[in-house]
A protein has these predicted regions:
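Ankyrin repeat start-site detector
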Residues: 34, 65-66, 98-99, 131-132, ...
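Ankyrin-repeat-protein effector appendages
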Residues: 1-38, 155, 188, 220-224, ...
Length: 329
């Protein structure tokens, strides 16, 4: 899956090593002091006295060259007292910077919990989207910060909001291997079968990464094993394509069990899939041990043949212009 956040990457215009830029948490702005006005510098530094003084001469919503307001900078750097003062001074809460991110998004991205709480309590919109279509909840899912995610959901953040690739916060949490976040979102009602622009589900994403624990969590909440994406592939196919032969065999066993209520002996030696209100029927099946009862050598050979067949068919479709989504290795 394409990475669309860019956390930790060096952006054009970032100061070179050894330059005098303000230290910042992950996701925060890289700042050159000389490029900021007095009010913006004071907000970024958390100097409340200077912020008070600056408001006598400058508008509370003044922008710098990157379209950041003092509130953006105070939120990114976690200066809750400055945030409170600016909010009480009637600053606008939902203005965008150059990346189309609001102060709330920056506070979430930088995991400034007090600032997030202040903004939400004063009516900041949790459902605004940045240049990539990500909302504050997408950013919390990737952080990952379950406390912030829970707070956003309590303030009516759309739990199944889709970014420009069609990914929901759940899909991103799965792609980043964040099991605690995945479980929180599912408990809060996230769609376990949400589909991106290529019709891929979170289960397919988990299978692509060989994430057995996440696969089990998703199955407990009713993930659909039979669903096919725009290439006609299932989660089992994705496990095969990415070389997770044991997982693909277990998914096949699970599908057989769902359809017939019976599973082979090899599929019953793994870790049980606990019963939940969402997936009570999964209590009778175990997932986790290699399904070796059909002959291990034969399985390896068959999955290798299946992988080659799938990739060959994909190449043929691609040559004919019928492929909408490519394989990501």
């Amino acid at each position: 899956m394409k990475k669309i956040f860019g956390f930790g990457r060096k952006k054009k215009g970032d100061p070179p090593p050894g330059s005098t830029a303000s230290p910042c948490p992950a996701g925060a702005y890289e700042l050159r002091q000389k490029e900021l006005g007095k009010l913006h510098r004071a907000a970024a530094a958390g100097d409340l006295a200077q912020v008070r003084q600056g408001l006598k001469k400058h508008g509370v919503d003044g922008r710098d060259k990157a379209q950041r307001t003092p509130l953006h900078l105070a939120c990114a750097n976690g200066h809750a007292d400055v945030v409170t003062f600016l909010v009480e001074s009637k600053c606008k809460l939902n203005l965008f910077d150059n990346d189309n991110r609001s102060p709330l998004m920056k506070a979430v991205q930088c995991q400034q919990e007090k600032c997030v709480a202040i903004l939400l309590e004063h009516g900041a919109d949790p459902n605004l989207a940045d240049a990539n279509g990500n909302t504050a909840l997408h950013l919390a899912a990737v952080a990952p910060n379950t406390f912030l995610a829970g707070m956003l959901i309590e303030h009516n953040a759309h739990i199944d909001a889709q970014n420009k690739e069609g990914c929901t916060p759940l899909t991103l949490a799965v792609s980043e291997h964040r099991q605690e976040m995945v479980e929180l979102l599912l408990k809060k009602g996230a769609d376990v079968n949400a589909r991106d622009l290529c019709e891929r589900t979170p289960l397919m994403t988990a299978a692509s990464g060989g994430e057995l624990k996440l696969v089990k969590v998703l199955l407990r909440y009713g993930a659909d094993l039979s669903h096919k994406d725009t290439n006609g592939w299932t989660a089992e196919d994705y496990a095969i394509i990415h070389g997770y032969d044991s997982l693909s065999n277990q998914l096949a066993e699970y599908a057989d069990w769902e359809n017939t209520g019976e599973a082979s002996a090899g599929a019953t030696r793994g870790i049980s899939v606990p019963m939940t209100p969402h997936k009570a029927r999964a209590a009778g099946f175990t997932l986790g041990a290699p399904a070796v009862d059909r002959g291990e050598e034969k399985i390896v050979k068959n999955t290798e043949e299946e992988r080659n067949s799938l990739l060959s068919r994909h190449q043929e479709q691609e040559n004919q212009g019928k492929v909408f989504c490519t394989v990501v290795f």
